[in-house]
Regions:
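Extracytoplasmic cell-surface/polysaccharide-interacting catalytic and binding patches
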Residues: 1-51, 61-154, 162-175
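Segments that shape or occlude catalytic/ligand-binding pockets
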Residues: 54
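Short, well-ordered surface patches within globular domains
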Residues: 57
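Conserved metal-phosphate-binding beta-hairpin within the catalytic cores
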Residues: 159
Length: 175
């Protein structure tokens, strides 16, 4: 997602990165999420948009949103960043057998209330999301939760492997 300028920053943030990386603990859990999805829908697969993120990239993201209404969607690097900066968070969705992402109501990286998971029934009721899109989000959360990940309330695509406190105690920040 950040290897192209088609993201909320409008910039390429990863020049030569072609693969996503996670801390092994999170990667093993993600394998379990993929297995859970395959048990339910054998033709579906998880698709990763972002995973481990160096603090240098976090600073670039923060500089785009600081002082705007979008600041709440990006972890402040001056406060230790977020779990992406430990390799313990993943931005993810589900794709079908043709490699097409399932509709989720918004694109990944869409920083607005429509991306929040806290009132999806209201979004359906107000015509901002279809029931199919809501069910797709629920499926994603189900398989990720089963594997031990926690959803971020403001971004349907973002899942944390552990809490920030655990990350600070047990893992190393990526500079």
């Amino acid at each position: 997602m950040y290897t192209q300028a088609d993201n909320f920053t409008g910039e390429v943030l990863y020049d030569n990165l072609t693969e996503a990386y996670l801390h092994p603990d999170a990667a093993y859990a993600l394998i379990e999420a993929q297995k859970a999805l395959k048990r339910l829908y054998p033709s579906y697969s998880l698709i990763i948009y972002d995973a481990a993120r160096p603090m240098s990239v976090q600073k670039k993201m923060w500089n785009v949103v600081k002082g705007t209404s979008k600041y709440k969607y990006v972890s402040n690097p001056n406060r230790g960043g977020g779990l992406h900066n430990y390799g313990l968070a993943v931005d993810i969705s589900i794709q079908d057998s043709l490699g097409q992402p399932l509709p989720m109501g918004t694109k990944v990286d869409h920083l607005s209330m429509e991306a929040h998971i806290t009132d999806e029934i209201g979004l359906v009721h107000n015509g901002k999301m279809s029931e199919t899109e809501r069910q797709n989000r629920l499926l994603l959360r189900k398989v990720m939760k089963e594997a031990g990940f926690r959803a971020l309330p403001s971004e349907w695509w973002h899942f944390n492997f552990c809490s920030r406190d655990v990350a600070k105690q047990k893992y190393k920040l990526i500079p």
